[in-house]
Amino acid sequence: MEKYEVNKTLELFETKIKDLENALDLDAINNRLKEIEPIMANPNFWNDSNQAKKISQELNQLTEKKQTITSIQNQYEDALMWLEEAKEGTESWDILEAEIDSLQKKISEFEIEVLLNGEYDHNNAILELHPGAGGTESMDWCGILMRMYERFAGYKGYKVEILNYLAGEEAGVKSVTLRISGPYAYGNLKSERGVHRLVRISPFDSNKRRHTSFVSCDVAPEIDETSEVELKDDDIRMDTFQSSGAGGQSVNTTYSAVRLTHIPTGIVVNIQNERSQIKNKEAAMQILKSKLIQKELEEKQAKLNALKGEKSDIGWGSQIRSYVFQPYQMVKDHRTNYEVGNIQSVMDGDIDGFINAYLKSKAYE
Protein backbone atom coordinates (compact mmCIF):
# COMPACT_ATOMS: atom_id res chain seq x y z
CA MET A 1 0.00 0.00 0.00
CA GLU A 2 1.43 3.37 -1.09
CA LYS A 3 1.48 6.33 1.28
CA TYR A 4 -1.17 8.26 -0.67
CA GLU A 5 -3.44 5.19 -0.45
CA VAL A 6 -2.94 5.05 3.30
CA ASN A 7 -3.81 8.74 3.64
CA LYS A 8 -6.97 8.35 1.54
CA THR A 9 -8.02 5.26 3.50
CA LEU A 10 -7.55 7.01 6.84
CA GLU A 11 -9.53 10.02 5.59
CA LEU A 12 -12.35 7.65 4.64
CA PHE A 13 -12.14 6.03 8.08
CA GLU A 14 -12.45 9.44 9.74
CA THR A 15 -15.65 10.16 7.80
CA LYS A 16 -17.11 6.75 8.56
CA ILE A 17 -16.32 7.04 12.28
CA LYS A 18 -18.07 10.42 12.45
CA ASP A 19 -21.09 8.94 10.66
CA LEU A 20 -21.15 6.07 13.16
CA GLU A 21 -20.94 8.49 16.10
CA ASN A 22 -23.88 10.46 14.72
CA ALA A 23 -25.92 7.34 14.04
CA LEU A 24 -25.27 5.99 17.54
CA ASP A 25 -26.08 9.28 19.33
CA LEU A 26 -23.55 8.75 22.11
CA ASP A 27 -25.16 11.45 24.27
CA ALA A 28 -28.44 9.53 24.21
CA ILE A 29 -26.62 6.28 25.06
CA ASN A 30 -24.84 7.89 28.01
CA ASN A 31 -28.09 9.42 29.27
CA ARG A 32 -29.88 6.08 29.05
CA LEU A 33 -27.05 4.31 30.88
CA LYS A 34 -27.38 6.87 33.68
CA GLU A 35 -31.12 6.16 33.85
CA ILE A 36 -30.60 2.40 34.01
CA GLU A 37 -27.99 2.50 36.78
CA PRO A 38 -30.35 3.48 39.66
CA ILE A 39 -33.08 1.17 38.30
CA MET A 40 -30.77 -1.86 38.53
CA ALA A 41 -29.46 -0.73 41.92
CA ASN A 42 -32.98 -0.92 43.37
CA PRO A 43 -33.25 -3.91 45.78
CA ASN A 44 -36.59 -4.86 44.16
CA PHE A 45 -35.16 -4.88 40.63
CA TRP A 46 -35.37 -8.67 40.20
CA ASN A 47 -38.91 -8.98 41.57
CA ASP A 48 -40.17 -8.69 38.00
CA SER A 49 -37.81 -11.12 36.30
CA ASN A 50 -39.10 -10.48 32.76
CA GLN A 51 -38.70 -6.72 33.03
CA ALA A 52 -35.31 -7.14 34.73
CA LYS A 53 -34.16 -9.36 31.86
CA LYS A 54 -35.19 -6.77 29.26
CA ILE A 55 -33.39 -3.95 31.07
CA SER A 56 -30.27 -6.09 31.56
CA GLN A 57 -30.22 -6.91 27.84
CA GLU A 58 -30.60 -3.23 26.99
CA LEU A 59 -27.71 -2.38 29.32
CA ASN A 60 -25.48 -4.99 27.68
CA GLN A 61 -26.35 -3.80 24.17
CA LEU A 62 -25.74 -0.12 24.94
CA THR A 63 -22.50 -0.86 26.80
CA GLU A 64 -21.23 -3.04 23.95
CA LYS A 65 -21.96 -0.33 21.35
CA LYS A 66 -20.21 2.31 23.44
CA GLN A 67 -17.18 0.07 23.97
CA THR A 68 -16.98 -0.81 20.27
CA ILE A 69 -17.03 2.79 19.00
CA THR A 70 -14.45 3.73 21.67
CA SER A 71 -12.22 0.86 20.53
CA ILE A 72 -12.54 1.98 16.89
CA GLN A 73 -11.72 5.58 17.82
CA ASN A 74 -8.63 4.47 19.76
CA GLN A 75 -7.43 2.21 16.95
CA TYR A 76 -7.86 5.06 14.46
CA GLU A 77 -5.69 7.31 16.65
CA ASP A 78 -3.09 4.53 16.84
CA ALA A 79 -3.07 4.29 13.04
CA LEU A 80 -2.46 8.04 12.75
CA MET A 81 0.43 7.71 15.18
CA TRP A 82 1.97 4.89 13.16
CA LEU A 83 1.58 6.95 9.98
CA GLU A 84 3.74 9.72 11.46
CA GLU A 85 6.49 7.31 12.50
CA ALA A 86 6.41 4.61 9.83
CA LYS A 87 8.44 4.55 6.63
CA GLU A 88 7.54 2.54 3.55
CA GLY A 89 9.32 -0.80 3.29
CA THR A 90 10.03 -1.04 7.02
CA GLU A 91 8.60 -3.24 9.75
CA SER A 92 6.69 -0.28 11.18
CA TRP A 93 4.98 0.18 7.79
CA ASP A 94 3.87 -3.46 7.88
CA ILE A 95 2.40 -2.82 11.33
CA LEU A 96 0.54 0.22 9.97
CA GLU A 97 -0.94 -1.80 7.09
CA ALA A 98 -2.03 -4.53 9.51
CA GLU A 99 -3.62 -1.88 11.73
CA ILE A 100 -5.53 -0.47 8.74
CA ASP A 101 -6.77 -3.92 7.68
CA SER A 102 -7.96 -4.63 11.21
CA LEU A 103 -9.67 -1.24 11.48
CA GLN A 104 -11.38 -1.71 8.10
CA LYS A 105 -12.89 -4.99 9.29
CA LYS A 106 -14.05 -3.50 12.61
CA ILE A 107 -15.69 -0.50 10.95
CA SER A 108 -17.47 -2.63 8.32
CA GLU A 109 -18.84 -5.02 10.94
CA PHE A 110 -19.94 -2.19 13.23
CA GLU A 111 -21.63 -0.33 10.36
CA ILE A 112 -23.95 -3.31 9.92
CA GLU A 113 -24.59 -3.57 13.66
CA VAL A 114 -25.52 0.11 13.81
CA LEU A 115 -27.92 -0.39 10.89
CA LEU A 116 -29.71 -3.05 12.95
CA ASN A 117 -31.50 -0.44 15.02
CA GLY A 118 -35.12 -1.45 14.47
CA GLU A 119 -37.40 -2.03 17.44
CA TYR A 120 -37.27 -5.82 17.05
CA ASP A 121 -33.96 -6.26 15.21
CA HIS A 122 -32.27 -7.80 18.27
CA ASN A 123 -35.00 -10.46 18.61
CA ASN A 124 -34.93 -14.09 17.58
CA ALA A 125 -36.52 -14.85 14.20
CA ILE A 126 -39.38 -17.09 13.11
CA LEU A 127 -38.67 -18.16 9.52
CA GLU A 128 -41.13 -20.04 7.31
CA LEU A 129 -40.61 -21.54 3.86
CA HIS A 130 -43.40 -22.52 1.46
CA PRO A 131 -42.87 -23.82 -2.10
CA GLY A 132 -44.88 -22.31 -4.94
CA ALA A 133 -46.20 -24.05 -8.03
CA GLY A 134 -43.91 -26.68 -9.48
CA GLY A 135 -44.47 -29.85 -7.47
CA THR A 136 -41.42 -31.90 -6.55
CA GLU A 137 -39.00 -29.41 -8.10
CA SER A 138 -40.29 -26.54 -5.92
CA MET A 139 -40.35 -28.74 -2.82
CA ASP A 140 -36.75 -29.76 -3.44
CA TRP A 141 -35.84 -26.07 -3.77
CA CYS A 142 -37.58 -25.46 -0.44
CA GLY A 143 -35.37 -28.11 1.18
CA ILE A 144 -32.25 -26.55 -0.34
CA LEU A 145 -33.16 -23.12 1.06
CA MET A 146 -33.85 -24.65 4.47
CA ARG A 147 -30.34 -26.07 4.47
CA MET A 148 -28.93 -22.68 3.39
CA TYR A 149 -30.53 -20.91 6.35
CA GLU A 150 -29.44 -23.64 8.76
CA ARG A 151 -25.85 -23.24 7.51
CA PHE A 152 -26.07 -19.44 7.81
CA ALA A 153 -27.32 -19.78 11.37
CA GLY A 154 -24.42 -22.09 12.16
CA TYR A 155 -21.88 -19.55 10.91
CA LYS A 156 -23.51 -16.87 13.08
CA GLY A 157 -23.58 -19.07 16.17
CA TYR A 158 -27.39 -19.07 16.15
CA LYS A 159 -29.53 -21.93 17.43
CA VAL A 160 -32.05 -23.50 15.04
CA GLU A 161 -35.21 -25.31 16.15
CA ILE A 162 -37.71 -26.92 13.78
CA LEU A 163 -41.18 -25.92 14.97
CA ASN A 164 -43.15 -27.38 12.08
CA TYR A 165 -42.04 -29.66 9.25
CA LEU A 166 -43.96 -31.30 6.42
CA ALA A 167 -41.92 -33.40 4.00
CA GLY A 168 -42.56 -33.60 0.27
CA GLU A 169 -43.97 -36.83 -1.15
CA GLU A 170 -40.94 -37.59 -3.35
CA ALA A 171 -38.31 -35.10 -2.19
CA GLY A 172 -37.81 -31.81 -0.43
CA VAL A 173 -40.13 -29.96 1.90
CA LYS A 174 -43.81 -28.95 1.64
CA SER A 175 -43.49 -26.41 4.45
CA VAL A 176 -41.21 -25.71 7.39
CA THR A 177 -41.13 -23.27 10.30
CA LEU A 178 -37.83 -22.55 12.05
CA ARG A 179 -37.03 -20.64 15.21
CA ILE A 180 -33.59 -19.06 14.77
CA SER A 181 -32.25 -17.78 18.09
CA GLY A 182 -29.34 -15.42 18.64
CA PRO A 183 -28.39 -11.73 18.81
CA TYR A 184 -29.95 -9.75 15.93
CA ALA A 185 -31.31 -12.89 14.25
CA TYR A 186 -34.41 -11.04 13.05
CA GLY A 187 -32.43 -7.95 12.05
CA ASN A 188 -30.25 -10.08 9.80
CA LEU A 189 -32.94 -12.34 8.40
CA LYS A 190 -35.68 -9.77 7.74
CA SER A 191 -33.99 -9.09 4.39
CA GLU A 192 -34.80 -12.68 3.33
CA ARG A 193 -38.53 -12.10 3.41
CA GLY A 194 -39.88 -12.55 -0.10
CA VAL A 195 -39.90 -14.95 -3.04
CA HIS A 196 -36.73 -16.81 -4.00
CA ARG A 197 -36.52 -18.03 -7.62
CA LEU A 198 -34.48 -21.00 -8.82
CA VAL A 199 -33.49 -21.71 -12.43
CA ARG A 200 -31.80 -25.07 -13.11
CA ILE A 201 -31.93 -28.28 -15.11
CA SER A 202 -34.22 -30.37 -12.95
CA PRO A 203 -32.82 -33.67 -11.64
CA PHE A 204 -36.44 -34.89 -11.63
CA ASP A 205 -36.93 -34.33 -15.38
CA SER A 206 -35.79 -37.28 -17.50
CA ASN A 207 -35.60 -34.94 -20.51
CA LYS A 208 -33.12 -32.67 -18.66
CA ARG A 209 -35.10 -29.53 -19.31
CA ARG A 210 -34.56 -26.26 -17.53
CA HIS A 211 -37.14 -25.48 -14.83
CA THR A 212 -38.04 -22.38 -12.82
CA SER A 213 -39.22 -22.80 -9.22
CA PHE A 214 -40.34 -20.45 -6.47
CA VAL A 215 -40.25 -20.56 -2.67
CA SER A 216 -41.78 -17.96 -0.38
CA CYS A 217 -39.79 -17.02 2.72
CA ASP A 218 -41.64 -15.34 5.58
CA VAL A 219 -39.75 -13.86 8.55
CA ALA A 220 -41.15 -12.37 11.76
CA PRO A 221 -39.54 -11.30 15.05
CA GLU A 222 -40.13 -13.71 17.91
CA ILE A 223 -42.07 -11.88 20.61
CA ASP A 224 -41.35 -12.74 24.24
CA GLU A 225 -43.93 -13.37 26.95
CA THR A 226 -43.83 -9.74 28.09
CA SER A 227 -45.33 -8.60 24.78
CA GLU A 228 -48.43 -6.44 25.05
CA VAL A 229 -50.08 -8.07 22.03
CA GLU A 230 -53.60 -9.08 23.05
CA LEU A 231 -55.47 -11.95 21.43
CA LYS A 232 -59.21 -12.41 21.94
CA ASP A 233 -60.42 -15.99 22.25
CA ASP A 234 -63.26 -15.27 19.81
CA ASP A 235 -60.72 -14.23 17.16
CA ILE A 236 -58.88 -17.57 17.21
CA ARG A 237 -59.92 -20.94 15.80
CA MET A 238 -57.91 -23.97 16.94
CA ASP A 239 -57.73 -27.26 15.04
CA THR A 240 -55.79 -30.34 16.15
CA PHE A 241 -54.33 -33.17 14.08
CA GLN A 242 -51.78 -35.97 14.27
CA SER A 243 -48.20 -34.79 14.03
CA SER A 244 -45.90 -36.33 11.45
CA GLY A 245 -42.15 -36.42 11.05
CA ALA A 246 -39.77 -36.37 8.10
CA GLY A 247 -40.90 -38.69 5.34
CA GLY A 248 -44.47 -38.65 6.61
CA GLN A 249 -43.82 -41.09 9.46
CA SER A 250 -46.15 -40.70 12.42
CA VAL A 251 -44.53 -39.21 15.49
CA ASN A 252 -47.42 -40.17 17.74
CA THR A 253 -51.02 -41.30 17.43
CA THR A 254 -52.53 -38.50 19.53
CA TYR A 255 -53.82 -35.25 18.10
CA SER A 256 -50.98 -33.18 19.53
CA ALA A 257 -50.31 -30.97 16.50
CA VAL A 258 -52.04 -27.59 16.59
CA ARG A 259 -53.26 -25.20 13.90
CA LEU A 260 -54.30 -21.71 14.99
CA THR A 261 -56.19 -19.40 12.65
CA HIS A 262 -56.49 -15.70 13.48
CA ILE A 263 -59.91 -14.99 11.98
CA PRO A 264 -59.62 -11.18 11.53
CA THR A 265 -56.36 -11.41 9.54
CA GLY A 266 -56.46 -14.95 8.17
CA ILE A 267 -52.99 -15.68 9.62
CA VAL A 268 -52.44 -19.42 10.16
CA VAL A 269 -49.84 -21.06 12.42
CA ASN A 270 -49.08 -24.81 12.47
CA ILE A 271 -46.96 -26.34 15.25
CA GLN A 272 -46.21 -30.03 15.83
CA ASN A 273 -42.69 -30.26 17.23
CA GLU A 274 -43.79 -30.97 20.83
CA ARG A 275 -45.50 -34.18 21.92
CA SER A 276 -47.87 -32.23 24.14
CA GLN A 277 -50.85 -30.43 22.59
CA ILE A 278 -50.64 -27.82 25.37
CA LYS A 279 -47.01 -27.00 24.57
CA ASN A 280 -47.74 -26.86 20.85
CA LYS A 281 -50.60 -24.46 21.50
CA GLU A 282 -48.37 -22.23 23.67
CA ALA A 283 -45.71 -22.15 20.94
CA ALA A 284 -48.33 -21.45 18.26
CA MET A 285 -49.79 -18.57 20.28
CA GLN A 286 -46.34 -17.02 20.63
CA ILE A 287 -45.67 -17.29 16.90
CA LEU A 288 -49.12 -15.88 16.12
CA LYS A 289 -48.23 -12.83 18.21
CA SER A 290 -44.96 -12.55 16.28
CA LYS A 291 -46.81 -12.61 12.96
CA LEU A 292 -49.25 -9.95 14.14
CA ILE A 293 -46.32 -7.74 15.16
CA GLN A 294 -44.77 -8.31 11.72
CA LYS A 295 -48.06 -7.34 10.07
CA GLU A 296 -48.20 -4.17 12.17
CA LEU A 297 -44.63 -3.30 11.17
CA GLU A 298 -45.51 -3.75 7.50
CA GLU A 299 -48.55 -1.50 7.76
CA LYS A 300 -46.53 1.26 9.42
CA GLN A 301 -43.78 0.98 6.84
CA ALA A 302 -46.27 0.92 3.96
CA LYS A 303 -47.65 4.26 5.12
CA LEU A 304 -44.13 5.65 4.94
CA ASN A 305 -43.60 3.98 1.54
CA ALA A 306 -40.65 2.11 3.01
CA LEU A 307 -41.88 -1.42 3.43
CA LYS A 308 -38.83 -3.51 4.33
CA GLY A 309 -38.51 -6.99 2.90
CA GLU A 310 -41.80 -6.72 0.99
CA LYS A 311 -43.30 -10.11 0.22
CA SER A 312 -45.17 -10.58 -3.05
CA ASP A 313 -47.37 -13.33 -4.43
CA ILE A 314 -45.50 -16.45 -5.49
CA GLY A 315 -45.09 -16.20 -9.24
CA TRP A 316 -43.29 -14.65 -12.18
CA GLY A 317 -41.82 -11.19 -11.67
CA SER A 318 -42.40 -11.13 -7.91
CA GLN A 319 -39.08 -12.55 -6.73
CA ILE A 320 -36.58 -10.67 -4.54
CA ARG A 321 -33.67 -12.91 -5.53
CA SER A 322 -32.80 -15.29 -8.36
CA TYR A 323 -30.52 -18.32 -8.11
CA VAL A 324 -29.42 -19.47 -11.56
CA PHE A 325 -27.67 -22.85 -11.68
CA GLN A 326 -27.79 -23.31 -15.49
CA PRO A 327 -26.85 -22.22 -18.15
CA TYR A 328 -24.54 -20.04 -16.01
CA GLN A 329 -24.10 -19.65 -12.25
CA MET A 330 -25.27 -16.48 -10.56
CA VAL A 331 -27.21 -15.37 -7.49
CA LYS A 332 -28.66 -11.87 -7.84
CA ASP A 333 -30.75 -9.77 -5.47
CA HIS A 334 -33.19 -7.70 -7.53
CA ARG A 335 -33.64 -5.05 -4.82
CA THR A 336 -29.98 -4.10 -4.51
CA ASN A 337 -28.43 -5.62 -7.68
CA TYR A 338 -25.87 -7.33 -5.44
CA GLU A 339 -24.74 -10.53 -7.14
CA VAL A 340 -22.38 -13.45 -6.56
CA GLY A 341 -21.03 -15.99 -9.04
CA ASN A 342 -19.99 -18.59 -6.46
CA ILE A 343 -23.39 -20.19 -6.08
CA GLN A 344 -22.14 -23.11 -3.96
CA SER A 345 -20.84 -20.71 -1.32
CA VAL A 346 -24.25 -19.04 -1.14
CA MET A 347 -26.09 -22.35 -0.86
CA ASP A 348 -23.70 -23.25 1.96
CA GLY A 349 -24.97 -20.25 3.94
CA ASP A 350 -22.71 -17.39 2.86
CA ILE A 351 -25.45 -14.76 2.49
CA ASP A 352 -23.92 -11.95 4.57
CA GLY A 353 -23.15 -9.96 1.42
CA PHE A 354 -26.82 -9.96 0.38
CA ILE A 355 -27.97 -9.05 3.89
CA ASN A 356 -25.46 -6.22 4.26
CA ALA A 357 -26.28 -4.78 0.83
CA TYR A 358 -29.98 -4.79 1.70
CA LEU A 359 -29.47 -3.11 5.10
CA LYS A 360 -27.29 -0.39 3.57
CA SER A 361 -29.74 0.23 0.73
CA LYS A 362 -32.61 0.73 3.20
CA ALA A 363 -30.50 3.03 5.37
CA TYR A 364 -29.68 5.35 2.47
CA GLU A 365 -33.17 5.51 0.92
UniProtKB/Swiss-Prot annotation:
Compartment(s) of residence: Cytoplasm
Post-translational modification: Methylated by PrmC. Methylation increases the termination efficiency of RF2.
Principal location listed in the UniProt entry: cytoplasm
Disulphide connectivity of cysteines: none
GO molecular function, one term: translation release factor activity, codon specific
Modified residues (N5-methylglutamine): 249
InterPro entries per UniProt: PCRF (IPR005139), Pep_chain_release_fac_I (IPR000352), Pep_chain_release_fac_I_sf (IPR045853), PrfB (IPR004374)
Single GO cellular component term: cytoplasm
Record keywords: Cytoplasm, Methylation, Protein biosynthesis
Homology family: Belongs to the prokaryotic/mitochondrial release factor family.
Name of the protein this chain belongs to: Peptide chain release factor 2
Organism: Acholeplasma laidlawii (strain PG-8A)
PANTHER family: CLASS I PEPTIDE CHAIN RELEASE FACTOR, PEPTIDE CHAIN RELEASE FACTOR 2
Gene transcribed to yield this protein: prfB
Function: Peptide chain release factor 2 directs the termination of translation in response to the peptide chain termination codons UGA and UAA.
